[in-house]
């Protein structure tokens, strides 16, 4: 998940890169070197949403990934610290979810990743205990729904939506907190449903739970035309609600990046998933994106 290039000026692209690199440094500063390897565009967009309307001047330094030319980055701030902590907590609990979802042999890579991230998770959890508890509780409820083979996509999506929405409650300003809670709630709902569509073929083949299978009574690992139309309406609803919440706050210099993501980027990703042309690295296991903007 990232902004659509067609809507970004060169200045916006540089600013988004600086957030991406600033979050990478924040992950290391807050949670240790291992935390840097969960960095991806989803978490960078979270950092954008949490950032104040005015951006500081970026700094420039070499780093582990770019030891010669270096990169611009924003220095550690409250927004980057919050994004870093919440990203680590979310990544760690998603790894626990992946371990539970796979057999002993298949879960080895997730166990290894969780072990590497353990120290980072403990630091982040101590800094954000409320979000840590919320993440655990929502994923546990989601696991129970999966075990029950819940046929309601709304009930299943609700847990991940509420989980992301809980990040908004970490923000002190009451108005911004409410705006972010709504934006992140509907973003979480959208992510859950798009992931379900992206995983549908594999889940059906492996006999794994996928809410779309039970909601639409699918007899193969592909959506019927009627099911696809219904899912598109549900995804569009979440994007519209997210956009409505966005309009209630002035995001300043970040407005173009957010608009590009909400009004175009999400539609393009959803379209690619439904057409079978989108191949994402599994979110449940985290994973670092390369800067290709």
Predicted regions and their residues:
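Membrane-proximal bilayer-interacting regions
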Residues: 258, 262-264
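Acidic catalytic motifs of isoprenoid enzymes
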Residues: 1-182, 189, 193-220, 224-228, ...
């Amino acid at each position: 998940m990232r902004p659509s290039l067609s809507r970004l000026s060169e200045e916006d692209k540089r600013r988004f890169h600086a957030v991406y690199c600033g979050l990478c440094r924040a992950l290391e500063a807050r949670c240790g070197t291992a935390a840097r390897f969960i960095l991806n565009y989803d978490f960078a967009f979270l950092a954008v949403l949490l950032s104040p309307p005015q951006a500081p001047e970026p700094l420039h330094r070499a780093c582990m990934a770019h030891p010669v030319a270096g990169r611009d980055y924003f220095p550690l701030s409250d927004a980057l610290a919050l994004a870093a902590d919440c990203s680590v907590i979310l990544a760690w609990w998603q790894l626990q979810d992946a371990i539970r979802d796979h057999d002993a042999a298949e879960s080895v890579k997730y166990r290894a990743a969780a072990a590497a991230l353990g120290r980072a998770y403990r630091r982040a959890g101590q800094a954000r205990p409320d979000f840590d508890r919320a993440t655990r509780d929502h994923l546990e409820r989601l696991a129970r729904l999966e075990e029950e083979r819940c046929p309601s996509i709304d009930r299943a999506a609700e847990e991940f939506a509420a989980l992301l929405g809980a990040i908004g409650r970490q923000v002190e300003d009451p108005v911004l907190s409410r705006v972010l809670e709504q934006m992140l709630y509907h973003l979480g709902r959208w992510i859950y449903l798009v992931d379900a569509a992206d995983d549908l073929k594999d889940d059906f083949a492996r006999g794994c739970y996928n809410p779309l299978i039970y909601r639409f009574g699918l007899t193969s690992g592909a959506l019927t035309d009627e099911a696809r139309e219904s899912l598109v309406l549900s995804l569009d609803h979440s994007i519209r609600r997210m956009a409505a919440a966005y309009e209630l706050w002035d995001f300043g210099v970040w407005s173009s990046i957010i608009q590009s993501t909400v009004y175009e980027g999400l539609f393009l990703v959803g379209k690619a998933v439904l057409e079978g042309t989108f191949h994402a690295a599994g979110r449940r296991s985290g994973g670092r994106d390369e800067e290709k903007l």
